[in-house]
Amino acid sequence: AGLRFTDCRVPDRYRLGEVGEGLHVAMYSLGLSRLHIADSNLGMAQRMLEMSIARAKERITFGKPLVKRQAIQTMIAESGKWIYLLRSAIHDAARRYEAGEDPMTQASLCKLASIDTVKIVSDNMLEILGGIGYFEECEYGPAERLYRDCRAMWLEEGPPSVQRTTAARGLITTGGD
């Protein structure tokens, strides 16, 4: 299925780029949109980590706060690691974009990393929050909504399989940079 315009005239003031460059303009915009999704996922992951830490500080089990337990500390550190790496990747991709580089490869890599990040952080959050994390609204924030929303982000601007293909093509073309 395709879309074809025959004898369609578009005034110059409405044209987004040069004639014949429409696909390039669309693909460039798609890269920026993927970077935006990665940044949105970063924000969700950061919020989930904050909720996890707040709960772990307050919840007492067997005489001490969850935050004092090594297993919980491991989940918090793992979540923090993924968030830090994603934030660094997004900053690098944004720097490249501002330098005039094509953001498609890095944007796809950032979106892939953001999917992994929110998956890990949301699983850790639900484990730390326990049963209250499944309620629509718990006292620490919208855990259930964040969990659901981060899963929906997988599909926006292409699922992970599309991101892998796009990233691989770009990496192969540039030799890995």
Model-derived regions: residue spans:
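Alpha-helical interface subdomain recognition
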Residues: G2-R4, E21, Y28-D177
